[in-house]
Amino acid sequence: MEISGKNILVVGLARTGVAVARFLARNGARVTVTDLRDESALAGPLRELAGLSVRYVLDRHDEADFAAADVVVVSPGVPQESPYLQAARRAGREVITEIELASRFVTVPMVAITGTNGKTTTTTLTGEIFSACGFRTFVGGNIGNPLIELVEGGETVERVVVEISSFQLEWISSFRPRVAVLLNITEDHLDRYATFQEYIDAKVRIFENQESTDYAVLNVDDPIVAGIAGRVAATVFPMSQQRELAEGVFHRDGVITFRHQGREERFPTARFRITGVHNIENIMASLAATLLLGCDAKQALAAVEGFGGLPHRMELVRELAGVRYYEDSKATNVGSVEKALASFNDITLIAGGKDKGGSYAPLAPLVTERVRHMVLIGEAKERMARELGSLTDTRMATTLEEAVELAASLTEPGGVVLFSPACSSFDMFRDYEERAQRFRAAVNALGTGERP
């Protein structure tokens, strides 16, 4: 892609926008940056771009800028129906996201990973396996470093692994990973998409530009994902925990088996540090992607056995008076909470937060079977109570700290207090990490007489 001399509009000045603007300006583009925040709110990002030839339109957007740009690079947070983006499209301008822009400059094999749940764990583990197998590897995308930072920095790598969100996929046009992974699809982001089908359609775009020499790793245990197999041009490489596969990767009797073109590799799971049905899925996907792109099985197994998982995903905080307290703040949708509930019995569930628009009804069977008490918080608590409250003993709390104290008083020895919200955090907290720390502080204050 030739960018020198082109008029390029960068929409949004968060970390990714800064990296995009810097890369473009240093490579001769005529860059305009626009953001709805004012100069004082953007002091940090503006300092990072000091000395570069960049025009700023702050505290507003100007439709004329969108219509005049050769290319508009948009933040994933900007919805497709934005009138400014529609103005750009009407004027025949190219609208892309950072991941599309950056991918045009990547020449080494790329693994792109998406799904409603498990993306970050799978992306991180895939990078760990590649590195253990001796490949210089970049890991980023929707986590950590934006892909454009690799392009901008000029670092020489041999493999690229990126986590991709549905938002990032909305504006791709030529993005083509060598291996694309779709872990699962459950209802999520219905505060962004008008229908569940719109969300599915965005996810499936990860395969849009692949060819038969590429691979689509599909979790065929997920009926929606399985239904996509006939729609992709890439070679489908299935994964399953429910059946043995002649070609693909599957789990049976404590062993993950990889089969491809006559090659078979076996990976006993007994020494894995991360457990649970969902983590076996993540590990299978990582093994598939890395072995398809040249990794040695023994080195891959050693990397998996050494991987301890990521924070805020079903982490044991402490055990007190025979009750175990688990923090699962990253569980921001129903699908991830289903997997958490399936991992325990005798649960006191703390849930709630900012409502994302999906139904909580899929949780009903597990709530009925495994949840003894439920304590609800946040903006979503009333709707959650309407959909699930009749299935078990259900209480309301005003704060997370109050919810923890109430859960502690309700739970018998041998039980589990599980904080798995099924909602985003933005009604009460800065992000899911702050929410996690508040839960941990409240749990650690139990029995001390102290206020968290």
Curated annotation (Swiss-Prot):
Enzyme Commission designation: 6.3.2.9
Broad class of the protein's primary localization: cytoplasm
GO CC terms, sorted: cytoplasm
Matches recorded under InterPro entries: Mur-like_cat_sf (IPR036565), Mur_ligase_C (IPR004101), Mur_ligase_C_dom_sf (IPR036615), Mur_ligase_cen (IPR013221), MurD (IPR005762)
GO process terms (BP): cell division; cell wall organization; peptidoglycan biosynthetic process; regulation of cell shape
UniProt subcellular location: Cytoplasm
One GO MF term attached to the UniProt entry: UDP-N-acetylmuramoylalanine-D-glutamate ligase activity
Catalyzed reactions per annotation: UDP-N-acetyl-alpha-D-muramoyl-L-alanine + D-glutamate + ATP = UDP-N-acetyl-alpha-D-muramoyl-L-alanyl-D-glutamate + ADP + phosphate + H(+)
Cell cycle keyword on record: yes
Pathway: Cell wall biogenesis; peptidoglycan biosynthesis
Source organism superkingdom: Bacteria
One protein family per Pfam: Mur_ligase_M
Residues annotated for ATP binding in this entry: 115-121
Keyword Transmembrane: no
Keyword line: ATP-binding, Cell cycle, Cell division, Cell shape, Cell wall biogenesis/degradation, Cytoplasm, Ligase, Nucleotide-binding, Peptidoglycan synthesis
HAMAP family: MurD
Annotated family: Belongs to the MurCDEF family.
Family annotation (NCBIfam families): murD
Cited function: Cell wall formation. Catalyzes the addition of glutamate to the nucleotide precursor UDP-N-acetylmuramoyl-L-alanine (UMA).
Protein name: UDP-N-acetylmuramoylalanine--D-glutamate ligase
UniProt gene name: murD
